[in-house]
Amino acid sequence: MTSRTEAVKAYLLDLQDRICSALETEDGGARFVEDAWVREAGGGGRTRVIGEGNVIEKGGVNFSHVFGSGLPPSASAHRPELAGRGFEALGVSLVIHPHNPHVPTSHANVRFFIAEKEGEEAVWWFGGGFDLTPYYGNEEDCIHWHRVAEQACAPFGADVYPRYKAWCDRYFHLKHRGEPRGIGGLFFDDLNEWDFDTCFAFIRAIGDAFVDAYLPIVQRRKNTPYTPQQREFQEYRRGRYVEFNLVYDRGTLFGLQSGGRTESILMSLPPQVRWGYDWKAAPGSEEARLTEYFLQDRDWLGQ
């Protein structure tokens, strides 16, 4: 393990600790349970799960560090120069599914890949971001989420937030449904356009921003009363979350194709979901407004 990899690993382990602590404090009831695991083909990780709390119905904050002699197809398909290289992949990935349908689901990920081959220069990149999936939209929450994202990106250039916001909108899109998964945030991959230290500083800024972006929204919405019908709608919309993760998500596909730990990879799936044949929201309802207004390609900071 190189000094670069060691520095990234130390940061990611600390990030996992800090996020878990903040979420436990906010929930006020449930605690994370840790499952340390070893990957037979190389590496391991710390899966931490939480559930049936005061706020969080199901959540997980995972750290993994895996390595192998060759990259799986999901990682090398768009980068053919990586074929035949050994690799290390480190990351923290989290998903939080709250009980209350007025509290959005959140997802964040920061990761580092390095691929090496004897006699050749190492190829490395960072990836990550965070995105928000509301069930009942609120403009105040959307603006706050994107404002924190913009502030995290600002020291690295005025063009960074718009680029990675647009990438997030493109990435978290269910092509077969013709709709986005949520209201976006940031997404980036293959990041090595700056030197290593700057790229590493950037993912630290993104990782550190998650709690500031999410917890104020949780605090505003966690005590909002809700009906059984609103809970049912939340479960229906969670179905879209499952569809995206199992069909499109590169992290999920990479994990499964590289022999990753299935329980940790599928931790992101919500605990209760429903599908209904050709279900449609009533015209003029809050449920209809979610897709008509919030789940659109919108400039939340420019309106």
From Swiss-Prot:
Its cofactor is a divalent metal cation. Pathway: Porphyrin-containing compound metabolism; protoporphyrin-IX biosynthesis; protoporphyrinogen-IX from coproporphyrinogen-III (O2 route): step 1/1. The record marks 176 as: Important for dimerization. It catalyses: coproporphyrinogen III + O2 + 2 H(+) = protoporphyrinogen IX + 2 CO2 + 2 H2O. One of its GO terms (cellular component) is cytoplasm. Pfam families: Coprogen_oxidas. The keyword Metal-binding applies. Its EC number is 1.3.3.3. Substrate binds at residues 93, 109-111, 259-261. The active site is at residue 107. Signal peptide: none annotated. One of its GO terms (biological process) is protoporphyrinogen IX biosynthetic process. InterPro entries: Coprogen_oxidase_aer, Coprogen_oxidase_aer_sf, Coprogen_oxidase_CS. Keywords: Cytoplasm, Heme biosynthesis, Metal-binding, Oxidoreductase, Porphyrin biosynthesis. GO terms for molecular function: coproporphyrinogen oxidase activity; metal ion binding; protein homodimerization activity. Residues 241-276 are annotated as: Important for dimerization. HAMAP family: Coprogen_oxidas. Belongs to the aerobic coproporphyrinogen-III oxidase family. Involved in the heme biosynthesis. Catalyzes the aerobic oxidative decarboxylation of propionate groups of rings A and B of coproporphyrinogen-III to yield the vinyl groups in protoporphyrinogen-IX. Homodimer. NCBIfam families: PRK05330.1. This is Oxygen-dependent coproporphyrinogen-III oxidase.
